[in-house]
Amino acid sequence: MVLYTRPPRLSVSRETFFGRQTPVVIPVFKEGDSIKLPEGLPQDLESLLKESYNSKAVSPEPGSVAKLPYRGGLVVTAGCGAPGDLEGVRRGFAAASRQVVDSFEEAQLYLVGLDTVSSTEAVIGALLGAYRLEEFKNTRKRKLQQLWVYGGEPRLDYAQAVAEGVYLARDIANAPPHRLPPAKLAAAVEDLFSKFDNVDVEVFSYDRLLEEGFGGIVSVGMGSEEKPRLIIIKYRGGAGEPIALVGKAVVFDSGGINLKPSQGMTLMRADKAGGAAVVGAMWTAARLGIKASIIGLIPAVINVPSGSSYLPSDVIRMWDGTMVEITNTDAEGRLILADAISYAAKQLGAKTVIDLATLTGAIVVALGPLIAGLFTRSDGLARAFEEASRTTGEKIWRMPMEDEYAKSLTQPAQAGEIVNAAQRYGGAIFGALFLERFVHGKEFAHLDIAGPGIAFEAGSLAPPYWPEKGMAPGYGVRLLIEVLSRMARGGG
């Protein structure tokens, strides 16, 4: 079972817990030169909070927290910025959750006066802030198991399902490679979705991949004794042509024969973050019953050097027949994605193909550790992602699909039709243009999540609802769910 870490349970409470041993989290908002507090607080507590603000012990800045003794219990303030600032609310409640996760088994969220959207994001922030991956530790610190919600109008089922999907993606992305090689990942996904009557999981074995000509997936995985798999999750939530989500799952990426430098190589356990996000999004879509037909494809491989590894100058026949000349074995993600993308477009009849991949270091150089690069020629799809980004706080930036650059995929090829790695500059664009060749005219979006997917050196820039210590944050699950929901409603 992959879902090692479960979010705290959510329940509605009909009364406040002031004066009990259970801490109460209270949002604090900016209002001019003062603060705005939620309605219905006891007068003495309101006075305490205002006095604490005047003494600078309490701040409304997003993500700031303070712990105040009150009536023998504990109040935790959550700085949320201006009223209506969804990111501020997420940060505030996530930071507050971090303050109690290791000390209390339960906490109460005071959401009086918050609308449905804000109160839902507050709950999501608190759930995500409580994440701890402790499966591989002998001593576990997390105590928090229950969140009580008082007031507001949060969509608790939605918040719980989203948090489960993000936790699942985090667990997969951060799992040590020996614990989740391709075959075990495939088996875990089969087990995970077996509880749904409207979800089918099909796993292509190495022999089947070889027999059916998935040259990209097979070649990248040849160097490892743990052979590759293609995991296909089919969710029957609605009629019509399916939407395909394709996620890169390189369980560990050493670079292959073009070996990476040792510095930072341990982060390459998270080179499966795109595939992890697709698994998490498929889980959440099924839990929520999104009214759409959705297919998740996760090509899973290990890219390591050995006597049987694929080599620079090899020419690979891809599933759709394209002949690709290998110029860099560390540009492996696009090879496994291309096979899955073309299969989704041509064999599975997808109307739209969306892929997520920790694809290039170039996108991290361009956009830093918090922002994913969005590549699409569809203005409608771009709008859906941009609106979803504003709602979820998962940052994106639309990047160009420059046709002139596409020449660099073909001109250097000596034996093949195209190369897998073109010139040095504009690497993120070349990666997107390479993948676009395999969608066969279908609507397409490529998300290069190398920055936020792995959280490269995010440090103090990371929001408090990301895991601590630079772990992969499960980026993309919330973004995908919002986009899929909009598409199901006809808004994407």
From Swiss-Prot:
MF terms in GO: manganese ion binding; metalloaminopeptidase activity
Q: Which residues form the active site?
A: K260, R334
Bilayer-crossing regions: none
Q: Which GO terms describe its biological process?
A: proteolysis
PROSITE patterns, alphabetized:
CYTOSOL_AP
Q: What chemistry does it catalyse, as a reaction equation?
A: Release of an N-terminal amino acid, Xaa-|-Yaa-, in which Xaa is preferably Leu, but may be other amino acids including Pro although not Arg or Lys, and Yaa may be Pro. Amino acid amides and methyl esters are also readily hydrolyzed, but rates on arylamides are exceedingly low; Release of an N-terminal amino acid, preferentially leucine, but not glutamic or aspartic acids
Provide the binding site for Mn(2+) 2.
K248, D253, D271, E332
Cite the cofactor comment. Binds 2 manganese ions per subunit.
Q: Which GO terms describe its cellular component?
A: cytoplasm
UniProtKB keywords: Aminopeptidase, Cytoplasm, Hydrolase, Manganese, Metal-binding, Protease
Q: Which family does it belong to?
A: Belongs to the peptidase M17 family.
Its function? Answer: Presumably involved in the processing and regular turnover of intracellular proteins. Catalyzes the removal of unsubstituted N-terminal amino acids from various peptides.
Name this protein carries in UniProt: Probable cytosol aminopeptidase
Q: Which organism is it from?
A: Aeropyrum pernix (strain ATCC 700893 / DSM 11879 / JCM 9820 / NBRC 100138 / K1)
Gene that codes for this?
Answer: pepA
